[in-house]
Amino acid sequence: MTQRERQILKWIEENPLISQQELADKAGIARSSVAVHISNLMKQGHIAGKGYIVRTAPYVVVVGGVNLDIGGRPHGELVAADSNPGQVRMSLGGVGRNIAHNMALMGLDVRMLTAFGDDMNAQRIAASCGELGIDISQCLTVPGGATSTYLFITDGHGDMALAVSDMEIYEHVTPAFLAGRARLLQNAQLLVVDTNIPAQSIAWLAENIRLPIFADPVSTAKAEKLRPVLGKLHTLKPNRLEAELLSGVSITDAASLNAAADALLATACGGYSSVWGATGCSPPTTAGGYTCPAVPERW
């Protein structure tokens, strides 16, 4: 399904009686083009015949962070307490948003639950999500709030040296907010959660939503939020430091990595994938494990 087809299907889901001309006006394209898109959607099985009877397709819900990322990388070695010539870029990020982005690129139907501020950054993120086909219609906008912003600096090799995050907006992703979207959550195929949201909200999801839950710890400071619910997770994706924290095992080599994995799997967590930065990732499960090399980042 193309991005345009996702957009048209979303409008049809919102208003099954909408006309082709109305769809054309909303999309800024010719009515004949809309007819072609609708024909394609019917062939793909998303629309069942005339009258825009929409089939309920499987979808994924992501609950977590959506940020404006500001990153700096020096041309050479990073020098502390000094101005470093280098490159600065702004991009859309957030662990949850990044996961949703990649799933949308894979053609999955993705619904996002998060909190936005009432600012231009939120508008920029919303526009990007619309282009990607990520549904943010159930998200919360906080009047007067500031959309989450993440500022980071890497060393000359691209590995993060330090970061500052302004993410107070996520305190609004409360259990009450999630309970108001329980139907959306319960009807999904799986749930992805990151630890940018409050610990009590993660606990509420683990206790009340009967879905496979995939969790990203985000950072060592936030990973502790997952400790009480480890046994209710389908899959956990920590980096080395987060895996050490949650497993209690110091990871220095492949053997200690496997020991950490065994400790986490013993909690009844169904799967585990440890990310080793530039080295790649190692996803052991109860059925065994293997290592995937990392794809170099391009600046």
Regions found by a protein language model. Give the residues of each.
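Conserved beta-alpha-beta core of the PfkB/ribokinase-like small-molecule kinase fold
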Residues: L190-A259, G280
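Structural detector of well-ordered beta-strand residues that form the stable sheet scaffold
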Residues: V61, R111, V192, F214-A215, ...
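Short pre-catalytic strand/loop immediately N-terminal to key active-site residues, enriched for Gly-Thr
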Residues: N84-G93, T291-W299
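Conserved phosphate-binding/catalytic region of the ribokinase-like
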Residues: M1-Q20, K26-S32, V36-R55, K222-A223, ...
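Hydrophobic anchor at the start of a short beta-strand
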Residues: V110, I136-S137, I213, Y272, ...
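Conserved N-terminal subdomain of the carbohydrate kinase-like
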Residues: T56-A57, H75-Q87, L105-Q189
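Positively charged, low-complexity intrinsically disordered leader regions
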Residues: S39, K43-L78
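Active-site alpha-helical elements of protease catalytic centers
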Residues: G93-R111
